[in-house]
Amino acid sequence: MSDLGDVFDAGRDEFAVLGPVLWNPIGEATVAEAGLRPGERVLDVCCGAGSSAIPAARAVGSDGHVDAIDLAERLLEQGRANARDLPQLTFTHADATRWDTTGYDVVQCVFGVFFLPDMDAASARLAGLAKPGGRFVVTTWGEHAIWPVPEILGDAVVAEGGAPQASPGRGPGERICTPDKLRGWLTGLGLEDVRVVTFEHSMPLDDTTSWAIVMGSAMRMRLKGLPESLLPKVRARFVDLLRDRKVDRMNAVSLIGIGRTAE
């Protein structure tokens, strides 16, 4: 997963641009649905700059604690800077597949499980870090989220001389992109009392945010190998194509799934 950490580190500035309009609202919604209470212990996996870890720390208060882990050190630095008033929140550079502290009231992962090397095995292991009767909370993209932005980016790359690529699809995220799929997947991990909430959200796509979602997310990998001199042309073409196709908002509908571990 270290390569992915490097991708998000490289997009730190753009990731910050997206915080108020994308990551933070979804992170706050996740914490609200998780029902965090004062004094609880929380593990936030793939925490980024803390969009869900920071509201979690506020929810558990000074008697609780949040461990927030990620592979992107520059995003962790950003999170620490944003959480100076929250001593109950610790940001740690760590691999989620190796974290072994147990006994959490809540283990939450926002937009992260589909990046794990083996989504099923790694997620089952993470759920096992919660105490008996604890909650495992997963937030993922809804079925129609993000698209057609990746395709338009691909068209812009090709139009400026980049190599065409087959559509990447949604990868493991395809298996958890509807309420029924996410509910079934969480149940398959052995969780009980599973429920899924749909959080409706969208993000405006202007000249700044449209490029930020490319450079501050995994879409950045589509630009790998392109010469730096080509990037301004790809950006200009991308913005033009969005305008030509009348795409001025990105669907960011998200699914929040919550299940309990066996007592």
Mark where each language-model region is.
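A short glycine-rich, Lys/Arg-flanked "PGG" loop and its adjoining helix->strand segment in the class I
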Residues: 120-135
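Class I SAM-dependent methyltransferase SAM/SAH-binding core
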Residues: 41-99
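Conserved class I S-adenosyl-L-methionine
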Residues: 137-163
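Conserved Class I S-adenosyl-L-methionine
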Residues: 3-11, 22-23, 49-51, 171-263
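Conserved alpha-helix/loop element of class I SAM-dependent methyltransferases that forms part
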Residues: 21-40, 55
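A short acidic, Gly/Pro-enriched loop at the edge of an enzyme's catalytic core
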Residues: 97-107
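A short hydrophobic/small-residue beta-strand
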Residues: 66, 136-137, 193
